[in-house]
Amino acid sequence: MINSMQFLYLVASYLFGNILTAYIVTKWRHDVDIRNEGSGNPGARNMGRVYGKGYFIVTFLGDAIKGAIVVSIAEYLFGDSTFVMLALLAVLLGHIYPIVFKGKGGKGISTFIGGLIAFDYLIALTLVAVFIIFYLIFKGFTKPGLITIACLPVCMILYSYSIVTTILSALIIVLILYVNRD
């Protein structure tokens, strides 16, 4: 059961997820809304396409750090891996469906990666190895990336996380795969 402090943390995590690095950077540097540029997605990939590698890196890092902050603080305050995974889900929902942008946010990959590294760097390293294998097979980033992300629940089981934590990780994967289905 979630107590009131945890509930408030989840709400704060969702709202923190509403901070979209791509939006802030393009407003600050170019006085435009990235949601009206390129693919219209306020994420690292669109930033890279429209403004170049530097903007991709800044956006990726900003959104990844956002996920890592939420996960790290949840771990510090509550110490329960199931709750930490729930906090990661909350920040992802805030990033993907931000209330301040009428539900039109990013696709969550950068935030997920940052949160996952903070959650368990060994799982993150395992998934990097899986990605490299699939990258060598498919010679691209999108398909190997999505296949790798789908391997998270298997890693959760291999690294002995609870069934509830593993199910939450599977829900996160379903969300990310749904948002990235195009």
Swiss-Prot record:
Listed EC numbers: 2.3.1.275
Location of this chain's protein in the cell: Cell membrane
Domain of life (superkingdom): Bacteria
Reaction(s) this enzyme catalyzes, per UniProt: an acyl phosphate + sn-glycerol 3-phosphate = a 1-acyl-sn-glycero-3-phosphate + phosphate
Keyword set includes Plastid: no
This protein's pathway: Lipid metabolism; phospholipid metabolism
Key words, A-Z: Cell membrane, Lipid biosynthesis, Lipid metabolism, Membrane, Phospholipid biosynthesis, Phospholipid metabolism, Transferase, Transmembrane, Transmembrane helix
Transmembrane residue ranges: 5-25, 54-74, 81-101, 117-137, 157-177
Protein name: Glycerol-3-phosphate acyltransferase 1
Lineage: Bacteria, Bacillati, Bacillota, Bacilli, Bacillales
Gene: plsY1
